[in-house]
Amino acid sequence: MKDGAAGSLNGIERRGLMFVLSSPSGAGKTTLSRMLVDEAPGLRMSVSATTRPKRPGEVDGRDYYFVDRPKFDAMVEAGEFLEWANVFDNCYGTPRAPVEAALSAGNDVLFDIDWQGTQQLRSRASNDVVSVFILPPSVQDLEHRLHTRAQDSDEVIRGRMKKAGDEMSHFDAYDYIVVNDNIGVAFESVKAILRAEQLKRERQIGIDAFVREMRRELEK
């Protein structure tokens, strides 16, 4: 259940942050992202633009902005993305305008992106980025999850498994590591990370005024 006002904690104004979840395909970042958005107050999911085909049940503008390759290339050329990458022959990118609007309003923005996108975000706004890398408990478990979700062909799954090793090699570029052996436990870990980062003094931009007012009252 969400509660509290966006842009504040205990009535203290704060700056929004960009919260990144990355993982090899099948390790659970998308499930964790949805759980976090459902429960964390003031957290909004960043909606990426993509050139990949729409999957059953997906809605344009909610899950992704589905665009063709010429449109995507034009957006890159115009500098409309905070980050973008080519993944499995499809392009993904984060539109700049809605993210900047959310942060300026004091909302947190959640990113379900790969390590390349994370590095691009850091290069543009390092102080506002908090990154978490999700690992599977084993290679066997990862492969089992990819087969169980029945979204991809065997050939695509082999490609995802091959890429997983490269993605895992960048774990040390992240602030936090969570092993997803149990989705409930992993979720509690990720939620605790978000809460701790929200409470950091430097993000509570209204804390000086809050303390000054209490001191003023004590001095009466």
Curated annotation (Swiss-Prot):
Q: Which GO terms describe its molecular function?
A: ATP binding; guanylate kinase activity
Write down the PROSITE patterns for this protein, in alphabetical order. GUANYLATE_KINASE_1, GUANYLATE_KINASE_2
Keyword Cell cycle in the entry? The reply is no
**Listed EC numbers:** 2.7.4.8
Broad class of the protein's primary localization: cytoplasm
Residues that hold ATP according to the record = 23-30
Where is it localised?
Cytoplasm
Pfam families the UniProt entry points to: Guanylate_kin
SUPFAM superfamilies (alphabetical): P-loop containing nucleoside triphosphate hydrolases (SSF52540)
Keyword line: ATP-binding, Cytoplasm, Kinase, Nucleotide-binding, Transferase
Q: Which GO terms describe its cellular component?
A: cytosol
Question: What function does this protein fulfil?
Answer: Essential for recycling GMP and indirectly, cGMP.
Q: State the family named in the UniProt similarity comment for this chain.
A: Belongs to the guanylate kinase family.
Name of the protein this chain belongs to:
Guanylate kinase
Give the organism, scientific name: Rhodopseudomonas palustris (strain HaA2)
